Amino acid sequence: MGLSDGEWQLVLNVWGKVEADISGHGQEVLIRLFKGHPETLEKFDKFKHLKSEDEMKASEDLKKHGATVLTALGGILKKKGHHEAEIKPLAQSHATKHKIPVKYLEFISECIIQVLQSKHPGDFGADAQGAMNKALELFRKDMASNYKELGFQG
C-alpha cells in the first residue's frame, strides 16, 4: 500500500501546481463534488442554498473552504505516509462533528483526480495519476481506521 519515493515525488510535483492556485483548485473540486454527488451538499449548512454552478462559482465561502480542504490534504501528502498526527484531528472532526462518511472521501478523491487531469494534463500522466490514487487511498484507509477507533461507522 505504501508509495515508493518516486511515487511520492510524482504526487508532490503535481501538488506544487495545486498550491500555485489552491483556492481555484479547491473551488473546482468542491463544485465537481456537489454537482456529481448532490447528497454531499447536505453535509455543508453553509453551502446548501447554492443550487447552480454559477452560484457556487460566485461563493467566496466555497472558494475559502476549497482552499482549506486542499491545504489540509497537502499537509498530509507532504508527510509521505507518516501523517498520523495530521490524520487524527481531521478524522475526529469528520467523524464526530461533521459526520462525513468514508464514501464521501472517495467521491472527493475522484474529484481531485478529475481536476488535476483537467488542469494539468501535461504534468498528470498515467504514472502521476496512479501515484496520486495510491496516496489518496492511503489517506482514506487511515481516515477509515481512525473512524473505526472512534466508533463512527461512516
UniProtKB/Swiss-Prot annotation:
> What subcellular compartments does it reside in?
Cytoplasm, Sarcoplasm
Q: Which residues, renumbered to this chain, carry the PTM Phosphothreonine?
A: 68
The domain of life is Eukaryota
Please list the reactions this protein catalyses. Fe(III)-heme b-[protein] + nitric oxide + H2O = Fe(II)-heme b-[protein] + nitrite + 2 H(+); H2O2 + AH2 = A + 2 H2O
A cellular component term, taken from the record's GO annotations: extracellular exosome
Which EC number(s) does the record attach to this protein?
Answer: 1.7.-.-, 1.11.1.-
Keyword GTP-binding tagged? no
Give GO terms for biological process: removal of superoxide radicals
Can you give the residue ranges of the Globin domain? 2-148
Annotated keywords: Cytoplasm, Heme, Iron, Metal-binding, Muscle protein, Oxidoreductase, Oxygen transport, Phosphoprotein, Transport
- PANTHER family the UniProt entry points to: MYOGLOBIN
Q: How does it assemble?
A: Monomeric.
Q: Which family does it belong to?
A: Belongs to the globin family.
Give the protein's recorded name. Answer: Myoglobin
Source organism per entry reads Gorilla gorilla beringei (Mountain gorilla)
Q: Top-down, what is the taxonomic lineage of the species of origin?
A: Eukaryota, Metazoa, Chordata, Craniata, Vertebrata
Q: Which gene encodes it?
A: MB
